[in-house]
A protein has these predicted regions:
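Short S/T/G- and acidic-enriched coil/turn segments that sit immediately N-terminal to beta-strands
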Residues: 48, 60-63
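Short proline/glycine-enriched turn/loop motifs at strand-loop junctions of beta-rich domains
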Residues: 26-32, 69
């Protein structure tokens, strides 16, 4: 049986603790969040599903510390949204941790399954718990470019590719 504590909302993603791994995810409109733990990279179904109730919710953050987990474990999330009048049927979707430092499952990943509403545990990407302290930031310094001289482009592809000459079928 897996033991979980309340955990902390920060840092986001997964982080090693003295007792296991802390998970934190932003899910503003969630009714609950599930952490799916996979035995190995190629697992098509989770070995454990940990449902986080409101005790693991602080504002928009959902968090839990799972005891006895180590670096290298494979995980993902599922989010059940509150009933907001929109029938999206995505609570079965396996979601990659947006703050993950390691991603696996590219060999079995199928984008078309990610876009459908049915369950996609057999073809999803999985996050990998990595030790944050091992990355040497000194070897990869920030670019020596001032923010005043930085140009950030934002493009909305729907409107960028939409034209009067485009034919939609």
């Amino acid at each position: 049986m897996t033991h979980i504590n309340k955990g902390k909302p920060f840092p986001l993603g997964s982080s090693l603790t003295s007792q296991g791994v802390n998970f934190s995810l932003v899910a503003t409109n969630a009714e609950y969040v599930e952490i799916l733990l996979f035995e190995k990279e190629g697992s098509i179904s989770p070995k454990s599903i940990l449902k986080l109730d409101q005790n693991h919710n602080t504002g928009p953050y959902w968090h839990a510390e799972v005891k006895n987990l180590n670096e290298g474990c494979f995980y993902a999330f599922r989010v059940k949204q509150k009933n907001n009048g929109i029938n999206n049927n995505y609570e079965k979707k396996v979601l990659l941790d947006p703050c993950s430092r390691g991603i696996t499952g590219w060999g079995s990943y199928k984008r078309e399954n990610a876009l459908e509403t049915h369950e996609n545990t057999n073809s999803c990407l999985k996050s990998v718990v990595c030790d944050r302290e091992l990355f040497n930031f000194r070897d990869y310094p920030r670019p020596k470019h001032s923010w005043e001289e930085t140009i950030i482009y934002c493009i909305i592809f729907l409107f960028y590719s939409k034209s009067i000459y485009t034919t939609f079928i």
